[in-house]
Each structure stands twice: as structure tokens, then as C-alpha cells.
Amino acid sequence: MALAKIVYASMTGNTEEIADIVASKLEELGLEVQVHECTTIETEEILDADLIVVASYTYSYGGDGELPDEIVDFYADLADLDLTGKVYGVCGSGDTFYDDFCSAVDDFDVMLGSRGATKGAENVKVDLAAEDEDIVNLEQFATDLVAKVNE
């Protein structure tokens, strides 16, 4: 059974809910899933996963989209890992009020791809909290990831 590790950062609970939606669908599709809040996992612990999912909100103090403080170390440590042979997906929440809507999702997409991992699904960006359409998109995201893992 393939192992998926989901690492998330959530301030308001919205991104944690996103991670839980993805985790539920991955489990339904037959993967073993471990969900970790980003401060409770060392970055190298993702190396035993077949699928890596990062879910992060974008912090926009003053309108400048930034990675949340609590996930910065995880992000920086990714630069030291070889993720060749791993499949990844990135999702997260943000606020469309800001020009940099969900830029943390884009940052993680670039980083994971640059470390040799294979993108398994298009990024999913959620405006604030997951609504019905977002849930459909997140479940499709999970389905696409499993298809890539099973190739």
C-alpha cells in the first residue's frame, strides 16, 4: 500500500480542513495516509512517503504574500532533499482580496519540483474556507494524485 504524507500549516483551521478533505479521499482510494501539522514533523521524515502533499495558507501582512512563519523551516529544509521518485501535490488557502492569492502554494510547487519530485495534480487554491465546489476540486486533486502514484 502506498504511503501519503500530508504536511500542513493552518492559522484559522481552513487549511487543516483542506488537508483533512484530501486525506479522507486518499484513504478512500486505498492509500495509507499520515497527516502532520508542519511543526510536528522533520522535513526528512517525508522521504519514506510515495506521495507528498503540502497544504499551506499564504500570510499576507500588508499585502505581501509570504510563507507562514511556522512552515518556513520545513520549506527551507526541502532544498537539501532529493525527492526523485516521489509524487507531490500542493493545495492551500488564501484570500482573493490580495494580489498574491495563495502564493505559498506556488512557492511549494516550485520547490518540490526543483527537488526532483513529480507533480501529480494541478495545484488547488481555496478562497478562505472550502465550499462545495472546492471540495469537489480537492477530491479530484486527490484522485489525480493516486492515479499518478499508481502509474
Indicate residue ranges for each PLM-predicted region.
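Aromatic-flanked redox-active Cys/Sec active sites in thiol-based oxidoreductases
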Residues: Y8-T12
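Short acidic loop-to-helix transition motifs that present clustered carboxylates
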Residues: H36-E42
